[in-house]
Design a protein with these regions (language model features):
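GT-A fold catalytic core of metal-dependent nucleotide-sugar glycosyltransferases
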Residues: 78-127
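A short glycine/serine-rich beta->alpha loop
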Residues: 68-75, 130-134
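N-terminal anchoring/stem segment of glycosyltransferases
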Residues: 1-70, 91, 273-274
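Short beta-strand-to-loop element that shapes/binds the nucleotide-sugar donor at the catalytic cleft/hinge
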Residues: 121-148
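Short acidic, S/G/P-rich loop/turn micro-motifs used as interaction or catalytic elements
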Residues: 15-18, 104, 152
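Conserved glycosyltransferase catalytic-site signature
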Residues: 76-83, 178-183
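Short His-Asn-centered micro-motif
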Residues: 10-15, 40-43, 76, 98-101, ...
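Catalytic core and acceptor-binding pocket of nucleotide-sugar-dependent glycosyltransferases
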Residues: 144, 150-264
Length: 275
């Protein structure tokens, strides 16, 4: 059984997305308390977000001004920077999830780490992801990328060293749709890892207990309510976790300080009660 303390969930947030950081941590602390959580920000924490974080305990770090070459970032840039960040400390982990900050992650059986490591081991590669279907636009991966850090960064550090200054200089030329996910695939193709296995996507989904979201994509819920979530495979499986999560005193405290997101999550829970 993999050791949960050897798991790291890493994400990034620019100023408009800081509002999701406390919620990202709240749900991960419930789901996988021993796992490390790392949030990299482009600017300083807003005062209201800092106050929310004082309510949280657990194994997490929120790092301000984490990208010294930037004073601030736009959405495309911050999403690309998650693929273009390496620290030696990452190599202490057996598994690392690099994904979106606007996620409420729930505990699953088997756990998140086990699901993705099984996919890696099945294909003999150091990453678990899929190629989006052709109807989704330019060929690219998804924005939730799970890796075996030691092997992944051994192959990817030359790509990081190449593309991070190119990103800053505006020299990466890719179509706008899914820009950061195209960059991720481009880095894989150009690295020693090469072309992903032909059966990458078809083996990905059976490896998962529910979906690649492993919970609720809060931004989808903001945009479309429960209908916005119904496109995620296995979304019904999360009913017990979301119902329990919205009933805690800590959830009520966070909601009082972040009523928009708290209200959305409470509304989603009410919708789940009807399933």
């Amino acid at each position: 059984m993999p050791d949960e303390s050897k798991m790291c969930f890493m994400t990034v947030a620019n100023r408009p997305y800081q509002k999701y950081v406390p919620w990202f941590l709240y749900f991960l602390n419930r789901a996988y308390p021993k796992a490390h959580k790392l949030v990299l920000l482009d600017v300083a924490l807003a005062d209201n977000i800092r106050q929310m974080l004082t309510l949280l305990s657990g194994n997490f770090e929120v790092r301000e001004r984490a990208f010294p070459e930037y004073t601030h970032t736009d959405a495309n840039t911050i999403k690309c920077l998650r693929w273009l960040t390496f620290e030696p400390a990452f190599e202490q982990y057996d598994c690392m999830s690099i994904g979106d900050v606007d996620m409420a992650t729930y505990v699953e059986t088997p756990p998140y780490m086990d699901q993705h490591l099984a996919h890696c081991d099945q294909l003999g590669i150091p990453y678990s992801n899929f190629i989006r279907p052709p109807q989704a636009g330019p060929r690219r991966m998804s924005g939730i990328h799970v890796i075996k850090p030691r092997e992944w960064f051994a192959a990817m550090r030359p790509m990081i060293n190449k593309y991070r200054p190119m990103l800053k200089a505006g020299q990466i030329r890719l179509p706008e749709q899914g820009f950061n996910e195209q960059l991720l695939l481009h880095m894989v193709l150009e690295s020693s890892l090469g072309e992903p296995p032909a059966n990458l996507s078809e083996t990905y989904w059976p490896s998962l207990a529910t979906s690649n979201h492993h919970g609720t994509h809060i931004r989808l819920a903001e945009c479309g309510g429960i209908r916005g979530l119904q496109g995620a495979k296995g979304y019904r499986n999360h009913k017990p976790e979301i119902l329990a999560a919205v009933k805690t005193p800590l959830f009520r405290q966070l909601s009082a300080m972040s009523p928009q997101i708290g209200g959305i999550l409470a509304a989603i829970a009410r919708a789940y009660e009807n399933f």
